[in-house]
Amino acid sequence: MKTFVAKPETVKRDWYVVDATGKTLGRLAAELARRLRGKHKAEYTPHVDTGDYIVVINAEKVAVTGNKETDKLYYWHTGYVGGIKQATFKEMIARRPEAVIEIAVKGMLPKGPLGRAMFRKLKVYAGSEHNHAAQQPQVLDI
């Protein structure tokens, strides 16, 4: 018996919409990363992008447990000397709520060209409106 290897041109990708309201950030991100990689499919192949497209709505309503709302810090560098910046989870949600989910999911995907291709299939929106109705996404309950 031969091992099945998925070919990029034969992979069937579905569109799903996920409502992040009240969902715990880490648990949501782990499941999104799993589905973006395609590990939920029987035809999963590690070196082929077999994952689905995922649209996340209501990113501003994602939850964290404990004191992480004030204690969790996000860091970035501007590129200038002494340009290290930081923001708490609460500040990030106020400034750019999509980034919170994007950063969490991106850290759970492979690093390299394949991981970047998987990450491009994730669409995150702060509110309940999205512009992917033409793809007829199915509701995914996580």
From Swiss-Prot:
CDD domains per record: Ribosomal_L13
Keywords noted in UniProt: Ribonucleoprotein, Ribosomal protein
GO cellular component, one term: cytosolic large ribosomal subunit
GO terms of molecular function: mRNA binding; structural constituent of ribosome
Entry annotated with the keyword Ribonucleoprotein: yes
Gene3D superfamilies: Ribosomal protein L13
SUPFAM superfamilies found in the cross-reference section: Ribosomal protein L13
GO biological process: negative regulation of translation; translation
InterPro entries: Ribosomal_uL13 (IPR005822), Ribosomal_uL13_bac-type (IPR005823), Ribosomal_uL13_CS (IPR023563), Ribosomal_uL13_sf (IPR036899)
HAMAP family the record matches: Ribosomal_uL13 (MF_01366)
Classification via PANTHER family: LARGE RIBOSOMAL SUBUNIT PROTEIN UL13M, RIBOSOMAL PROTEIN L13
Job description of the protein: This protein is one of the early assembly proteins of the 50S ribosomal subunit, although it is not seen to bind rRNA by itself. It is important during the early stages of 50S assembly.
Family named by the database record: Belongs to the universal ribosomal protein uL13 family.
NCBIfam families in the cross-refs: rplM_bact
Subunit record text: Part of the 50S ribosomal subunit.
Protein name listed in UniProt: Large ribosomal subunit protein uL13
UniProt organism field: Histophilus somni (strain 2336) (Haemophilus somnus)
